[in-house]
UniProtKB/Swiss-Prot annotation:
Protein name according to UniProt: tRNA sulfurtransferase
GO MF entries: ATP binding; CCA tRNA nucleotidyltransferase activity; tRNA binding; tRNA-uracil-4 sulfurtransferase activity
Domain THUMP as annotated: residue spans: 62-166
Organism: Yersinia enterocolitica serotype O:8 / biotype 1B (strain NCTC 13174 / 8081)
High-level lineage: Bacteria, Pseudomonadati, Pseudomonadota, Gammaproteobacteria, Enterobacterales
Cellular component aspect of the GO annotation: cytosol
Entry binding sites for ATP: L184, I185, K266, G288, Q297
Amino acid sequence: MKFIIKLFPEITIKSQSVRLRFIKILTTNIRNVLKNLEDDTLAVVRHWDHIEIRTKDDNLGPQICDALTRVPGIHHILEVEDRSYTDMHNIFEQTLEAYRETLIGKTFCVRVKRRGKHEFSSGDVERYVGGGLNQHIESAKVKLTHPQVTVHLEIDQDKLTLIKARHEGLGGFPIGTQEDVLSLISGGFDSGVSSYMLMRRGCRVHYCFFNLGGSAHEIGVKQVAHYLWNRFGSSHRVRFVAIDFEPVVGEILEKVEDGQMGVVLKRMMVRAASQVAERYGVQALVTGEALGQVSSQTLTNLRLIDNASDTLILRPLISHDKEHIINLAREIGTEDFAKTMPEYCGVISKSPTVKAVKAKIEEEESHFDFSILDRVVNEAKNVDIREIAAQSREQVVEVETVAELADTDVLLDIRAPDEQDEKPLKLDGIEVRTLPFYKLSTQFADLDQSKSYLLYCDRGVMSRLQALYLREQGYTNVKVYRP
């Protein structure tokens, strides 16, 4: 099985040296992502205008394709089959064999890319093959604009490449081609989408979380960060830094006037994140702020927030409306996380100012004990995001993990609905119920609490995190099922 990876167009217009660097980085990223497949026959080979992937294990095709569609820097992926040919009629015969079943009852067109010296042009092949397919396939019709099926062929000297399928890629730049950034992540719609947008633009995104809601809040945000990394950025190691910001909030509530609290809190977050960024050599902060979305996000207030630090602050969503942000969250898979994530920042100020005055803000901050800010930053927890799974095991030692179920146990499948549909969980004599992880916080209480529930997910990470969360909420009838 062979895949041809086409580069994002912005890569192809770079200078020769920059383009080569981008291609090398993309090739390395692909190898890092695919190494989890443990396929000894897998080969990744870079070329000037594309990257080839070959494997002798055809069963891995769907997994390879799925992984590639989530690697930044790829425009599209072609699933291809290389053949030799003798003449133009032979090209038609091979195309007919490959596409006969696909084109029955469909409109189609033929598109050919050709390299090398031949007695025919690309247009000649398109007309000859298209006409032949039209004559030999029942109810198939040629339609050059917006056909139902496009038959893609590539001819390189004496080699014919049949393109069996085309899959759209993520686009953007390969991660690592730009410098590192630190995303201020809250787990909501905005911070998840803004993190994704910087990953797609080639940045390795680290995460900084300001904990205002206890360990349950931290667990939820870790889930979002781990999901984003695992889905779009697993080619690189990244940090997850958690800062206990409750002492800072307490100091603000005690020392700062109500109307100024929102802006002061954001300035404190920027100061703390800037210290973290400087510690790890990160060049910029990323936030999910959008102009005018909340009181602290007016131009006047954003300028004052920026002035709290010399560190560059990137706001990829600055001109996006909320509906567009939610749509993007839905596309990348973070919507369900965000729906159930509590928003703590908005509750500390009852009458927030929309046009803060610098002198007033500085006066309010003069009452603040900055040693508290320094202390929480120094005590920040820094973990490799890959260790979140191991950390969850340590945190839930009080939650029993079992490999066998009793007849009275209820197996609770907490995987996402699409995963449940793809691999339904069935065990003889055991009651199996489905409740996606993002609904546990709101719907677990509705279940029969006289029963014992064993939480299940594919790798055991989400089930452990959710078991810890439910334990903290006072539920003692939960365990983790790991067969």
